[in-house]
């Protein structure tokens, strides 16, 4: 699949920009530094896809036709947390580490963002052999694949974006792991209970998730909630407390917060 890559100067704070994209249901974007060290926004449009409304007055400084494969090959393998590597181009051959391969499909989320990194950190810290894991808002499937490779017995990954579901399925096949990937509007299509629910989405969506999360968890379950801008942390904590969840551990990188929660 071919995409039009547009490069625009970053006019607003990163967290505000991410929120706007999520509100529009647009996920093919990246925030990077140009050769001068200035942050720029890259977005990727499919043929005939319109520019998100809030960007229509932004200056476009460059554009070109590209493919996801072109984008992926620019990335070198990297260690997302100690002992776990993201390998977009299959350059790593190690038996002493967990390696997550990424297919050059149609997704642009690769684990570079701190919210993904913190989620993987807590999965590695708290996941026990044989745990069951639910990944809500799975995107490319990195968290679900990591959970399975860390020893989870059953992993379910859901997303409301059909494109994300396709990409996650491709990455699951690429990594030869047993993960069920399916479409679901938050927990609408989820059945059963899980030992760990991990979700790397926006604070407002976490608030909605918390309304129903007790149905898919048990007394000893754990929540790992990431993608929370620090100024909205208290909002998530209040909603969690209303439903019987307390913060066990907190981690922050830049303005992004990840919370680990247990039942009170």
Curated annotation (Swiss-Prot):
GO cellular component: cytoplasm
InterPro entries named in the record: Ribosomal_L11_MeTrfase_PrmA, Ribosomal_PrmA_MeTrfase, SAM-dependent_MTases_sf
Principal location listed in the UniProt entry: cytoplasm
Top-level taxonomic group: Bacteria
Binding-site positions, S-adenosyl-L-methionine: 116, 137, 159, 200
Class of enzymatic activity (EC top level): transferase
Swiss-Prot/TrEMBL keywords: Cytoplasm, Methyltransferase, S-adenosyl-L-methionine, Transferase
EC number: 2.1.1.-
Localization annotation: Cytoplasm
UniProt record, GO biological process: methylation
Molecular function terms from GO: protein methyltransferase activity; protein-lysine N-methyltransferase activity
Entries under SUPFAM superfamilies matching the protein: S-adenosyl-L-methionine-dependent methyltransferases
Catalytic activity: L-lysyl-[protein] + 3 S-adenosyl-L-methionine = N(6),N(6),N(6)-trimethyl-L-lysyl-[protein] + 3 S-adenosyl-L-homocysteine + 3 H(+)
Function (record text): Methylates ribosomal protein L11.
Similarity comment: family membership: Belongs to the methyltransferase superfamily. PrmA family.
Record HAMAP family: Methyltr_PrmA (MF_00735)
Protein name per its UniProtKB record: Ribosomal protein L11 methyltransferase
Originating species: Thermotoga maritima (strain ATCC 43589 / DSM 3109 / JCM 10099 / NBRC 100826 / MSB8)
């Amino acid at each position: 699949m071919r995409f039009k890559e547009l490069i625009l100067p970053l006019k607003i704070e990163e967290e505000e920009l991410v929120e706007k994209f999520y509100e529009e249901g647009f996920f093919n974007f990246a925030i990077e530094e140009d050769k001068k060290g200035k942050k720029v926004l890259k977005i990727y449009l499919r043929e005939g896809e319109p520019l998100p409304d809030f960007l229509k007055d932004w200056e476009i400084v460059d554009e070109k036709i590209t493919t996801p494969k072109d984008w992926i090959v620019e990335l070198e393998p990297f260690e997302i947390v100690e002992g776990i590597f993201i390998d977009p181009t299959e350059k790593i051959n190690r038996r002493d580490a967990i390696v997550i391969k990424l297919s050059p499909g149609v997704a642009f989320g690769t684990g570079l963002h701190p919210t993904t990194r913190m989620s993987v950190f807590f999965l590695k810290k708290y996941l026990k052999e044989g745990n069951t894991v639910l990944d809500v808002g799975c995107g490319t499937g990195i968290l679900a694949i990591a959970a399975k490779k860390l020893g989870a017995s059953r992993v379910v990954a859901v997303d409301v974006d059909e494109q994300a579901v396709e990409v996650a399925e491709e990455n699951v096949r690429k990594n030869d792991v047993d993960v069920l990937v399916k479409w679901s509007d938050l927990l609408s299509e989820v059945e059963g209970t899980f030992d760990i629910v991990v979700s790397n989405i926006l604070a407002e969506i976490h608030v909605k998730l918390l309304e129903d999360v007790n149905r898919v968890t048990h007394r000893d379950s754990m929540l790992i909630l990431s993608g929370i801008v620090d100024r909205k942390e208290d909002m998530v904590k209040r909603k969690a407390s209303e439903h019987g969840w307390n913060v066990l551990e907190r981690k922050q990188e830049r303005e992004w917060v990840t919370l680990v929660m247990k039942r009170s």
